[in-house]
């Protein structure tokens, strides 16, 4: 789920009766690693063998097995009619007429209203892109890159100039990070092929990372946000314990990789400074090597070739490596505080099989709308709208927001909006609370 593209070869068959009828109990019994069914629009599909070739990755689609994946399917696939052609060989049948369309006793009215909201937003043109927005956005990133080189050409590599160009490069890298995010979600072009190509250019050539690595992690996060064992962004046991449930579970099991009761303090040392220059950088290289992803590796190398071409004449090879590391160090602070402010303070739990709207609202919150916040966060201050509609161009989030809030109010679902500083403080408060829960369970349970 996620990524679109050709899904299966003609003639590949799902096992079972193509015209069969099934109950939810039967579907839910096929949710193991080696036996996977799912439901989309009441049709039952066997994805067991094919999941390995899913364009969005095996894990993201496997996370939805045994349940209704209709809303996830709509969220991740821009051309559903095209994709459905390749799903036909996987079709087993349909739910029995007596079965509801929703699983796990989900609120049918809420789900129907959410789907109506999506159709209404589509009819309002909120899934249509403004080309000028993205042209100007890419332009300001390239301008920052050009200014940093121009500083060197005209003023040399003194300390003040080096610090100034480091800030310019960190800003361009952070903004390129938000832009690759847009292309990765297929939210810019009508033809997803161009999104994929631009994604590789932005994340590979402009940032020195891997598109496939990012997709594999990020689609899982979107499909099951803040859900243990399914969202890789909350799998931090070796460093942090998050939420209210996991700290108690780990404390009872006497798991102690770190003094978690102090995590709100050491977070400032191991989180914002090191995530990009150390963990992500090494993980990108490891993933490309293990997956033999030579295309992304070529894009990755093109970034470093360009960087050394411009900067090694002034800093040398070693000095250029120091410069890259310092730029990533600066960018990492920006990235961590922005990406975690919407999620760490929210619910983190095992999968409760909630409907799409409820699941996303439990795991996300918004930050106040302003021109600065929009630019600074790459419009991730509208995290709720982004998670509900990941293919919506971000310049339309502010128009969708009032309608999403109205639907949430109708069903008593909390729609949280915070100030920027408040959201950052909530990260630290949440880490402190989780650490205290772990310590209490570790010592007394």
From Swiss-Prot:
<keyword id="KW-0560">Oxidoreductase</keyword>
<keyword id="KW-0472">Membrane</keyword>
<feature type="topological domain" description="Cytoplasmic">
    <location>
        <begin position="1"/>
        <end position="131"/>
    </location>
</feature>
<keyword id="KW-0275">Fatty acid biosynthesis</keyword>
<feature type="transmembrane region" description="Helical">
    <location>
        <begin position="159"/>
        <end position="179"/>
    </location>
</feature>
<feature type="short sequence motif" description="Histidine box-1">
    <location>
        <begin position="181"/>
        <end position="185"/>
    </location>
</feature>
<feature type="topological domain" description="Cytoplasmic">
    <location>
        <begin position="180"/>
        <end position="265"/>
    </location>
</feature>
<dbReference type="GO" id="GO:0005789">
    <property type="term" value="C:endoplasmic reticulum membrane"/>
</dbReference>
<feature type="topological domain" description="Cytoplasmic">
    <location>
        <begin position="328"/>
        <end position="445"/>
    </location>
</feature>
<feature type="topological domain" description="Lumenal">
    <location>
        <begin position="153"/>
        <end position="158"/>
    </location>
</feature>
<comment type="function">
    <text>Component of a lipid metabolic pathway that catalyzes biosynthesis of highly unsaturated fatty acids (HUFA) from precursor essential polyunsaturated fatty acids (PUFA) linoleic acid (LA) (18:2n-6) and alpha-linolenic acid (ALA) (18:3n-3). Catalyzes the first and rate limiting step in this pathway which is the desaturation of LA (18:2n-6) and ALA (18:3n-3) into gamma-linoleic acid (GLA) (18:3n-6) and stearidonic acid (18:4n-3) respectively and other desaturation steps. Highly unsaturated fatty acids (HUFA) play pivotal roles in many biological functions.</text>
</comment>
<feature type="transmembrane region" description="Helical">
    <location>
        <begin position="307"/>
        <end position="327"/>
    </location>
</feature>
<keyword id="KW-0249">Electron transport</keyword>
<feature type="domain" description="Cytochrome b5 heme-binding">
    <location>
        <begin position="19"/>
        <end position="96"/>
    </location>
</feature>
<dbReference type="InterPro" id="IPR005804">
    <property type="entry name" value="FA_desaturase_dom"/>
</dbReference>
<dbReference type="GO" id="GO:0016213">
    <property type="term" value="F:acyl-CoA 6-desaturase activity"/>
</dbReference>
<feature type="topological domain" description="Lumenal">
    <location>
        <begin position="287"/>
        <end position="306"/>
    </location>
</feature>
<comment type="similarity">
    <text>Belongs to the fatty acid desaturase type 1 family.</text>
</comment>
<protein>
    <recommendedName>
        <fullName>Fatty acid desaturase 2</fullName>
        <ecNumber>1.14.19.3</ecNumber>
    </recommendedName>
</protein>
<keyword id="KW-0443">Lipid metabolism</keyword>
<feature type="transmembrane region" description="Helical">
    <location>
        <begin position="266"/>
        <end position="286"/>
    </location>
</feature>
<feature type="transmembrane region" description="Helical">
    <location>
        <begin position="132"/>
        <end position="152"/>
    </location>
</feature>
<dbReference type="Pfam" id="PF00487">
    <property type="entry name" value="FA_desaturase"/>
</dbReference>
<feature type="short sequence motif" description="Histidine box-3">
    <location>
        <begin position="383"/>
        <end position="387"/>
    </location>
</feature>
<keyword id="KW-0813">Transport</keyword>
<dbReference type="Pfam" id="PF00173">
    <property type="entry name" value="Cyt-b5"/>
</dbReference>
<comment type="pathway">
    <text>Lipid metabolism; polyunsaturated fatty acid biosynthesis.</text>
</comment>
<dbReference type="GO" id="GO:0006636">
    <property type="term" value="P:unsaturated fatty acid biosynthetic process"/>
</dbReference>
<keyword id="KW-0276">Fatty acid metabolism</keyword>
<dbReference type="InterPro" id="IPR036400">
    <property type="entry name" value="Cyt_B5-like_heme/steroid_sf"/>
</dbReference>
<keyword id="KW-0812">Transmembrane</keyword>
<keyword id="KW-0444">Lipid biosynthesis</keyword>
<keyword id="KW-1133">Transmembrane helix</keyword>
<feature type="short sequence motif" description="Histidine box-2">
    <location>
        <begin position="218"/>
        <end position="222"/>
    </location>
</feature>
<dbReference type="InterPro" id="IPR012171">
    <property type="entry name" value="Fatty_acid_desaturase"/>
</dbReference>
<dbReference type="InterPro" id="IPR001199">
    <property type="entry name" value="Cyt_B5-like_heme/steroid-bd"/>
</dbReference>
<keyword id="KW-0256">Endoplasmic reticulum</keyword>
């Amino acid at each position: 789920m996620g990524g679109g593209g050709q899904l299966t070869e003609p003639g590949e068959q799902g096992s079972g009766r193509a015209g069969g009828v099934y109950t939810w109990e039967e579907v839910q019994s096929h949710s193991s690693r080696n036996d996977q069914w799912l439901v989309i629009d009441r049709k039952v599909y066997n994805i067991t063998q094919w999941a390995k070739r899913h364009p969005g990755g095996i894990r993201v689609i496997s996370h939805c097995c045994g349940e209704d994946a209709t809303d996830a399917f709509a969220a991740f696939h821009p051309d559903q009619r095209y994709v459905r052609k390749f799903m036909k060989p996987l079709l087993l049948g349909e739910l029995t007429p007596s079965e509801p369309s929703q699983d796990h006793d989900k609120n049918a009215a809420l789900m129907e209203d959410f789907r109506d909201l999506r159709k209404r937003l589509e009819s309002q043109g909120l899934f249509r892109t403004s080309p000028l927005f993205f042209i100007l956005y890419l332009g300001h990133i390239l301008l920052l890159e050009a200014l940093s080189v121009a500083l060197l050409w005209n003023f040399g590599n003194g300390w003040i100039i080096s610090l100034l160009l480091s800030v310019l490069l960190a800003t361009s890298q952070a903004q390129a990070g938000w832009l690759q995010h847009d292309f990765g979600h297929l939210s810019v072009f009508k033809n997803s092929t161009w999104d994929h190509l631009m994604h590789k250019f932005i994340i590979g050539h402009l940032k020195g990372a891997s598109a496939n690595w990012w997709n594999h992690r990020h689609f899982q996060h979107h499909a099951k946000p803040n859900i243990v064992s399914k969202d890789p962004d909350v799998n931090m046991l070796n460093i942090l314990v998050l939420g209210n449930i996991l700290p108690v579970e780990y404390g009872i099991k006497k798991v102690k990789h770190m003094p978690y009761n102090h995590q709100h303090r050491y977070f400032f040392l191991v989180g914002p400074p090191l995530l990009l220059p150390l963990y992500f950088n090494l993980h990108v290289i490891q993933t490309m090597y293990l997956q033999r992803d030579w295309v992304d590796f070529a894009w990755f190398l093109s970034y470093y070739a360009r960087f050394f071409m411009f900067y090694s004449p002034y800093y040398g090879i070693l000095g250029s490596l120091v410069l890259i590391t310092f730029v990533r160090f600066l960018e990492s602070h920006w990235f961590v505080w922005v990406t975690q402010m919407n999620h760490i303070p929210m619910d983190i739990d095992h999968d409760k099989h909630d409907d799409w709207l409820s699941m996303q609202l439990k795991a996300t919150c918004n930050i106040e709308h302003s021109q600065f916040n929009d630019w600074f966060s790459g419009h991730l201050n509208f995290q709720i709208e982004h998670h509900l509609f990941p293919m919506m161009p971000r310049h339309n989030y502010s128009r969708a927001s009032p309608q999403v809030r109205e639907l949430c109010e109708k069903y008593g679902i909390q729609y949280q909006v915070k100030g920027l500083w408040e959201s950052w403080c909530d990260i630290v408060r949440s880490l402190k609370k989780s650490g205290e829960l772990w310590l209490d369970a570790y010592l007394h349970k």
